[in-house]
Amino acid sequence: MSSKLVNYLRLTFLSFLGIASTSLDAMPAGNPAFPVIPGINIEQKNACSFDLCNSYDVLSALSGNLKLCFCGDYIFSEEAQVKDVPVVTSVTTAGVGPSPDITSTTKTRNFDLVNCNLNTNCVAVAFSLPDRSLSAIPLFDVSFEVKVGGLKQYYRLPMNAYRDFTSEPLNSESEVTDGMIEVQSNYGFVWDVSLKKVIWKDGVSFVGVGADYRHASCPIDYIIANSQANPEVFIADSDGKLNFKEWSVCVGLTTYVNDYVLPYLAFSIGSVSRQAPDDSFKKLEDRFTNLKFKVRKITSSHRGNICIGATNYVADNFFYNVEGRWGSQRAVNVSGGFQF
């Protein structure tokens, strides 16, 4: 493949990432060359650049490698919402006496999260199957990774996103009050599986794709309800857990700067959902008979992020990676690992 064609492909790929990001929530992409990291250092490996092995022996070609990794993912803000919530826009009372006819007019609305952050700390085991051939389109160069650890999350959203205006008729429009709900969890168990594949390489650059799925269940720390009509703060509690699910797919390009630093650019797209326990507001409903709540799912669907990061090879069997992502999430991911 000519150098002009290679440069053209790189430019086209980077342009595609920039254009797509304006129209498209997602997890960290990671380095596209992860399946062959860190065994690509020229001086320490005494091999051609990014050529892991020149042997054509079948056993050598199929031999894999194991990585023990650590990682932390920190989301500072995120775009998500509760969709299609029926909200009362007007209340009409007809008739007189103790039981007048009350008619409510409703309209569906979407409520955005006002604030949201998430911290994840995990250890991981990754098994990679490198491709020993010199082919530009490798058959292998694939890795499978499993992560386990702890996840803690916080979010704040308008109270009406969790209000239930349809179970009982309202006496007046004044009962449709504005306010805020805050939910904070403790650290709960999280697991994550990912698959990464190098789909093209030329000895200097890599193009890779990946898919990730993350699931967490976090015990509730506190739930705060604050209505503007009543400035008193009410704390609800629950023995349930805050469920969190996320999936993501990504595509990325990396080109090494020198023998020890490998920067990359990637684009990721995915979906996130959060679900608070159904009994989150039971105590508030028992105390205030005119307040009814319905816990609804918070989602962020098919939104994308631009991911920019770099991998540093400290030694022939150790590496670390720092990545930032912008878009529907503003987040930083830090990871590293040892190869065995």
From Swiss-Prot:
Instruction: Kindly list the GO molecular function terms attached to this UniProt entry.
Output: porin activity; structural molecule activity
Where does this protein reside within or beyond the cell? Cell outer membrane
Q: Which UniProt keywords apply?
A: Cell outer membrane, Ion transport, Membrane, Porin, Signal, Transmembrane, Transmembrane beta strand, Transport
- TM annotation in the entry: none
How is this protein annotated for GO cellular component?
Answer: cell outer membrane; pore complex
Q: Which BP terms in the Gene Ontology apply to this protein?
A: monoatomic ion transport
How does the protein's chain sit in the membrane according to the entry? Multi-pass membrane protein
Leader sequence residues = 1-26
Pfam families documented for this protein: Chlam_OMP
Q: What family, per the record?
A: Belongs to the chlamydial OMP family.
Q: What is this protein called?
A: Outer membrane protein B
Source organism: Chlamydia trachomatis serovar D (strain ATCC VR-885 / DSM 19411 / UW-3/Cx)
Per the UniProt record, the lineage of the source organism begins with:
Bacteria, Pseudomonadati, Chlamydiota, Chlamydiia, Chlamydiales
